[in-house]
Regions:
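Active-site- and interface-proximal helix/loop "cap" or "latch" segments in soluble metabolic
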Residues: 13, 35-202
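Short, Gly/Pro- and small/polar-rich lid/capping loops
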Residues: 1-42
Length: 202
């Protein structure tokens, strides 16, 4: 259902975050995230006036992953920044993401490696969207999310486990209507120790 009707108001700032996933010709996947900040007016920054229409920030983060969600390459780019010539020193630090796994405590580890002066606060924010973007990209493509289940980042090839997505949000709880209607085989099941539980929610 939509949000309630707002009181009269005026747009002062727009931040947009988007993520896209690409299957590559070499069998790997690229997960890209972009953050932009705009103001609907000229803005006086410490470095000068930023005219209306030009972004305050336009930041990019790309990780290349295999089908087990291991990060095999990473790069960042600061296209528009409030401190030109200075903010661009941060992107090389994001090579530190190589070797992490998007499903296993990625947000915690990315924050440990890149928080504060180790990186750019906004690029580090973008790290948070990568795990679920990858999971959404893999669902129904790399992983089977239908009733038979048995696939996901920790699957063993035997359909003894429910579909990856079950038990990970309120709508998909095992005793809920969605599972009863669409995944009856798993209705009422319990899975106390979900692989990776919490790792995509940190």
């Amino acid at each position: 259902m939509p949000l309630s009707e707002p009181v009269p108001r005026q747009l002062r700032h727009r931040r947009a975050i988007r993520a896209e996933a690409y299957e590559r010709g070499d069998g790997l996947w690229d997960i890209e995230a972009c953050l932009t900040d705009h103001k609907p007016r000229d803005v006086a920054l410490a470095s000068g006036i930023r005219p209306q229409g030009l972004p305050i920030h336009e930041l990019w983060l790309r990780v290349t992953i295999d089908r087990e969600l291991n990060v095999v390459d990473a790069e960042a780019s600061s296209e528009w920044v409030p401190y030109p010539g200075q903010c661009q020193s941060a992107p090389p630090a994001y090579r530190a993401l190589i070797g992490l796994n998007l499903f296993r405590h990625f947000r915690r580890d990315a924050n440990r490696l890149l928080a504060g002066v180790a990186g750019c606060s906004h690029l580090t924010e973008l790290c948070a969207v990568l795990p679920t973007a990858a999971i959404q990209a893999f669902a129904g493509d790399v992983w089977n999310v239908r009733e038979e289940g048995g696939e996901g980042p920790d699957h063993d090839g035997v359909h003894a486990e429910p579909p990856f997505q079950l038990g990970r949000c309120r709508a998909l709880r095992f005793d809920g209507e969605v599972v009863r209607q669409y995944y009856p085989r798993w209705y009422g099941a319990s899975r106390p120790d979900l692989p990776g539980e919490g790792s995509t929610k940190e």
